[in-house]
Amino acid sequence: MIEHRPPAWAACLLLLAACGQSESPAKNSVTVKLPPAGVPVAPESSYSSIDPASCKVVGDSIRRCEGAAGYALEMDGEVAIVAPDGRRSILDLSKLGTKGAPKLGAKAEWRGPAPGHPHVLIVRVGSDLAIARLEYPACIVAVVAQQSHQNEKAREIADGKLPACLSR
């Protein structure tokens, strides 16, 4: 019996023919479309409720509100950001003139290059907007007093180079 084998160059042709073909992604993979290099990515916001009715009570008195991308806010007289890995950072709201438990708005805005990748939290405290960086240890980096275009001003700060923490 004579064995017929294709020439070695045939394998090269098959490889070249496959070039330019797209592979189908694995079933458990995530495909992210990125803009071309050098094109800036517009920041995006996602929102979560911090209304007491939508949060759960953990322990004796801590109210835990789920946020974006695995983050959470915990409140019991103070406000803490809980990172996806479980690390807690207590936000110092004393610079906002709050006495006792701070009066928070009904929602938190999580801002970053994509909804699933926030790097900043914007939350209403009284009539002010507090901007907190999420990088551990999280901290408040700016406060925007009540004014016209307050939300836009807070987003402008959040989308730029973040200032240093206001206090530790």
Q: Model-predicted segments: where are they?
A:
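A short, solvent-exposed beta-edge/loop patch
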Residues: G112-R168
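Charge-rich, low-complexity N-terminal segments
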Residues: E3, C19-L93
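Mature extracytoplasmic domains of secretory-pathway proteins
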Residues: A80-V125
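Sec-dependent bacterial lipoprotein signal peptides
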Residues: M1-A17
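Acidic/proline-rich low-complexity IDRs
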Residues: C12-L15, K33, K103
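Generic structural hydrophobic/aromatic packing signal, biased to beta-strands
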Residues: Y47, C55, L73, A108-W110, ...
